[in-house]
Amino acid sequence: MKVRSFIMRLKDTGLTAQELKDMVNKYMVETYERYDFIAERAEGMYLYDEEGNAYLDFYGGVAVNSCGNRNPKVIAAIKDQLDDIMHTFNYPYTIPQALLAKKICDTIGMDKIFYQNSGTEANECMIKMARKYGVEKYGPEHYHIVTAINGFHGRTYGALSATGQPDNACQLGFKPMLPGFSYAEYNNLEDFKSKVTDNTIAIMIEPVQGEGGVHPATQEFMKGLREFCDENDMLLLIDEVQTGWCRTGAVMSYMNYGIKPDIVSMAKGLGG
């Protein structure tokens, strides 16, 4: 007999659709303007509500479910892992951790990886690594980073400070932001150069901006940033949280430009 540990269908809760929505509104902090349907299950490219209506899932878990909803191979891999270890800590060696690290490094041509829990944490780590590099090599004032206007790097404090949307609701109410960031116009190499100071240690960029549309970087811009960073001993940090893992034709989006970052962040599609 198949036993469910958690109730998964609305009919099993004894609630109406409106009662469930009211429960969410009562007990959860309202940070999103929700669509007016209940996503009860998913399959492939579709979400289904409690009445069986299908919705084409353009979000993909917001760039997470690259293999589709409930992909059989992904589900099988998760179940196999749960039969061995569900979660452990970093002190023991584990087989999947080692194999995945080698696979990622071999695939994207990097030397090492550092595991995090989310995309915003990966971006926080990039910022910390760049600052550490600048401070240790050049002194305590060398921590300045230039990022793009209308970019998005996450909602934790450092990543939010790197997000070039100072007048957006995502920053309002949380100021002052972490110091050491300047914002330049996307796809404008000269504007980026103008924001660089004697204390700038890195440029942080998304290959495709996803805020307010889909805005890819030009070949000239990305190659120009790489050359400019090389000439001035600055790090090029590329945020591939949304664009990474085959979402733009290449394994990583920066590969479309024939360049290589000093540090790259990834998440979302890496998990599914």
What is the predicted function of each stretch?
Residues V3-G272:
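Conserved N-terminal phosphate-binding loop of PLP-dependent enzymes in the Aspartate aminotransferase
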